Amino acid sequence: MEPEPEPGSVEVPAGRVLSASELRAARSRSQKLPQRSHGPKDFLPDGSEAQAERLRLCRQELWQLLAEERVERLGSLVAAEWKPEEGFVELTSPAGKFWQTMGYSEEGRQRLHPEEALYLLECGSIQLFYQDLPLSIQEAYQLLLTEDTLSFLQYQVFSHLKRLGYVVRRFQLSSVVSPYERQLNLDGYAQCLEDGSGKRKRSSSCRSVNKKPKVLQNSLPPVSLAASSSPACDQSSQYPEEKSQDSSPRQGSELPLQFLGSSEPCSDLAREDVGCDRESHKIENGAKGTPKLRWNFEQISFPNMASDSRHTFLPAPAPELLPANVIGRGTDAESWCQKLNQRREKLSRRDREQQAVVQQFREDVNADPEVRGCSSWQEYKELLQRRQTQKSQPRPPHLWGQSVTPLLDPDKADCPAAVLQHISVLQTTHLADGGYRLLEKSGGLQISFDVYQADAVATFRKNSPGKPYVRMCISGFDDPVPDLCSLKCLTYQSGDVPLIFALVDHGDISFYSFRDFTLPRDLGH
């Protein structure tokens, strides 16, 4: 049934400038919403004229509400043009307040995504043109929501979240930090390297680091690594000399770079010298004993850098201890010593009790005489390996010498929780485990939007948005339920940000999520 035209009503075509009479009529129309309740509900028609009149009035109010067009000032609208070939909307006039959280800049132009332009068109913030003709909201729905841009379900979720006040941005897979980068705390560093266009900035520190080896390579002469070896290792020290003589001049020029830039040659020299001292010690004594250290720490004087020290001048180091192009000089450390904080830390009673409890069960590594006898890091690792081997050797032969062995080693039975963990059949797993192997098996589902909280609108920056509050994956009510493979893939792509599934059922939107949980254990038995 078509609505009857009301006398005095004004029909205004979309995009046309109103005249004075039309503007007065648009301003004077009622702002009240239609009455939602008209008394008791009639379940069946009774054929009376009163019922037909009530039904006609309800339909007339509904048609008037749907046919009413929004009137906006032309000067407050931002002009924009839809470009279907590129798939974006380009602003032809300066943007408004919405530019703080929406849109992006590329090639010096301000652009909007289709969902952003359609939402702003419904809000009355922009005027959208296509082929120099203004578009109505119905035409914009038909042109902007296609298979190449985004679906109608995605726009429903986008507009719903925007009306709730959230900041919604398109999901970029390149912005997700890998678990390895999060383990190394590189997520903040990677965020600082990205500018507004999503490109990596050049780092000045990287250029300076690359320039330093060139200067060293040109200025440092080749140095033989066997020059400081002891006489007891003459036979072993001939190999570096023969290699340096047979090598090309290019390899000889790279030798100081390797010596200065890496600690491995230094550790190799120290290891060779320590080995030579060990061999000479074994030959002199004729028995295996504790190796003698090369350095006598009683004769080495370390500078006193305490705040109460009178002598704060540090003399220049010996020239033979420095590279050829480095000049050492003395330093007065008085200003630095005055900045030292000598005040004793004041702990509360609770902190002192906790510290005392922790110290009761803490073993001091330096108190171990065997550890103090190690002269290098390699000897300390060998000591730990030897102790681990001795600890795993004592096993009852009648239990471990047969085909059937116990479920776990006695050394691993430290507590009931460890025993239950080793003998459990179902191991604890997380939803994102193994997701890197399933990146191509998402099952058609994909993450659509990054959602930021509404209270972050005032401080939100598009070039540095920060960590999203949640990530949104959109599905229809008639679509199949995602399988475990798809859930693992999407959870891995989301990283450490919670993943929310938006389920759209004929305009009604419900939100679901999958979370990890740990099964309880009975440790009392």
UniProtKB/Swiss-Prot annotation:
What segments bear the compositional bias annotation Low complexity? 7-23, 220-232
Look up the signal peptide feature and give its range.
none
Q: Name the domain of life this protein comes from.
A: Eukaryota
Q: Where Phosphoserine occurs along the chain?
A: 178
N-acetylmethionine: which positions carry it? 1
Main subcellular localization, coarse class? nucleus
Tell me a GO biological process for this protein: tRNA splicing, via endonucleolytic cleavage and ligation
Compartmental location = Nucleus; Nucleus, Nucleolus
Q: Does the keyword Acetylation apply?
A: yes
| GO CC term, one of those recorded | nucleolus
* InterPro entries assigned: tRNA_splic_suSen54 (IPR024337), tRNA_splic_suSen54_N (IPR024336)
Residues modified as Phosphotyrosine are 180
Which keywords does UniProt give here?
Acetylation, mRNA processing, Nucleus, Phosphoprotein, tRNA processing
Q: Where is this region: Disordered?
A: 1-46, 220-273
Subunit details? tRNA splicing endonuclease is a heterotetramer composed of TSEN2, TSEN15, TSEN34/LENG5 and TSEN54. tRNA splicing endonuclease complex also contains proteins of the pre-mRNA 3'-end processing machinery such as CLP1, CPSF1, CPSF4 and CSTF2.
Describe the family membership recorded for this protein in Swiss-Prot or TrEMBL.
Belongs to the SEN54 family.
Query: Any idea what job this protein has?
Result: Non-catalytic subunit of the tRNA-splicing endonuclease complex, a complex responsible for identification and cleavage of the splice sites in pre-tRNA. It cleaves pre-tRNA at the 5' and 3' splice sites to release the intron. The products are an intron and two tRNA half-molecules bearing 2',3' cyclic phosphate and 5'-OH termini. There are no conserved sequences at the splice sites, but the intron is invariably located at the same site in the gene, placing the splice sites an invariant distance from the constant structural features of the tRNA body.
What name does the UniProt record give this protein? tRNA-splicing endonuclease subunit Sen54
Recorded source organism is Mus musculus
Gene giving rise to this polypeptide = Tsen54
